[in-house]
Amino acid sequence: MAAAEPMGPAQVPMNSEVIVDPIQGQVNFEDVFVYFSQEEWVLLDEAQRLLYRDVMLENFALMASLGHTSFMSHIVASLVMGSEPWVPDWVDMTLAVATETPGGSDPGCWHGMEDEEIPFEQSFSIGMSQIRIPKGGPSTQKAYPCGTCGLVLKDILHLAEHQETHPGQKPYMCVLCGKQFCFSANLHQHQKQHSGEKPFRSDKSRPFLLNNCAVQSMEMSFVTGEACKDFLASSSIFEHHAPHNEWKPHSNTKCEEASHCGKRHYKCSECGKTFSRKDSLVQHQRVHTGERPYECGECGKTFSRKPILAQHQRIHTGEMPYECGICGKVFNHSSNLIVHQRVHTGARPYKCSECGKAYSHKSTLVQHESIHTGERPYECSECGKYFGHKYRLIKHWSVHTGARPYECIACGKFFSQSSDLIAHQRVHNGEKPYVCSECGKAFSHKHVLVQHHRIHTGERPYKCSECGKAFRQRASLIRHWKIHTGERP
């Protein structure tokens, strides 16, 4: 086994080439690692150090998921423990080229050799590579849940190893083009292609990219450029001026240099929209041409994009690969799982710009906004009546058809809507799912709870236009209005 000369972290050349095996496409962890001296490290604040740690650990997880588990084990261990990343005095920095062994080590990989006299307390492994953590490490660590099956792992290294048990599972999907990824970081990098955002913004960050461009030949990219920019840009010690022509992420097309400069060269002749990639333009043009080249073999339905066809086919196969880690409910689309999880988190990301009311679904916000705009886009073809919500039109349509397909098995009463049947059944079972947060009183219908809650808030939204008197309930306003009209109540 041939050994190289000892090398400290400050001696590592920042613009060294990535070692790539021409057959295997081997990429080493050292090639995407950012080195700091102790003097450089103290200039970073806490947020920058945490960002550094997260970026490096995610890079390692990506390496491990690809089966490339070569790394400097003492540095990865210090990242897991949250300690400083520079090389301690007790570490023997002798690097050796590992030969192929019966244990299955990858040929041509670099492995860090530690001092055998240093006592260690914990150890854990990824594949054939083992990390040992010194005594005195933290007793508690952050939990890392698997985005595919919900299993919670104790560290990111075990998570990376576990995710290899889900072949072909890519839970992170781009909502613009349907492309799927194993890691959220890859999705984030991919989305910059749609937004036109430049992945690497200045020559200042070049020394820390460690020729990340060479890694782009693989299917998964590493989080080094954009994420590192946030803490590199704040410190003047990282200034490095290099001519633009030294940095060549690609080599063949004319558009690649323009893409690095943030330009978009592929323009749609129909609407003028521009794209940085030709395949994105081709997909977009199907909006104008109506082309749907991907056909479902089961039902014959066609789609403009292959990932959408794959999602559709789960209707026929019954496949439900996305499971909620909290309640166990399964879904056929990752987007449905994301929307469902808002039930548990209470997240309401869609906010009305007029009144500030927030909703968990975008469609609900659109329906709500019609209250402010007065828009009623849904017209009944029978009587010409307009409605602000589509579901109200559907409900109204039963007036003309007389259809009441939903029957109560307790009393035989029929209803035109399933929601009306569910609400009616509470008369029989006594269920009162809507509880007042102020006094604890429960109600069988949500609108009754809303009316009751106004007792606590003092809200009186229904105002008489004649005398100005306000009421908590609409029915009370209608009864009051008869005083002015002279109509007998």
Swiss-Prot record:
GO biological process: regulation of transcription by RNA polymerase II
Origin: domain of life: Eukaryota
Main location: nucleus
Localisation: Nucleus
GO CC term (a single one): nucleus
Keywords: DNA-binding, Metal-binding, Nucleus, Repeat, Transcription, Transcription regulation, Zinc, Zinc-finger
KRAB domain sequence ranges: 27-98
Transmembrane segments: none
Protein name: Zinc finger protein 772
Species annotation: Homo sapiens (Human)
